[in-house]
Amino acid sequence: MLIVAKMVEEKFLQIDGHKIRYLESGNSKNTLVLLHGLGASAERWLNVIPLFSKEYTVIVPDLIGFGLSDKPHADYTPEYFIDFLEQFFEQTGITRPNLIGSSLGGQIAANYTSSHTDEIEKLILVSPAGAMSQSTPALDAYVMAALYPNEQTAKNAFELMEASGEEVPQEIITGFIGRMRLPNAK
């Protein structure tokens, strides 16, 4: 077990024989689950985990196929991710979580909630995928960075997505490149 950041614990479990990594922080009866977007990982939420963990037990999985979770050759359909969340919640003992999803994670959260309405306390969507009919420059840059992970493509993608105008931390760029170079990460 590794400490990823102050007060954030890294854990692993198995779903259908696949290793799933997740981060956990806080000690509350109220649970908040954060779902990352396409090509991202749990690290995408590191800056807000300490804030949320003051009020919630925060659980942040690397979705199956992403981050440091296994990347099986599978058909990554909405139903596949719904099944993943069902098993993840069951194995971690999570009941009636607050659920926040960003990008692809938002689409997964919305799909899950629509079929499990009585099992989610609150749903918050942050720029959910599936609502746009065309691409954007930021999405195009992100796809290029995922396909050709190097310092320049990653920095370009993250700079286009950074709304505050602040410089993207080097550990975000380095971590992204490392995860995109893992086997089956594309």
Q: Model-found features: residue ranges?
A:
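Conserved HGGG/HGGXW glycine-rich cap/lid loop of the alpha/beta-hydrolase fold
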Residues: H18-L68
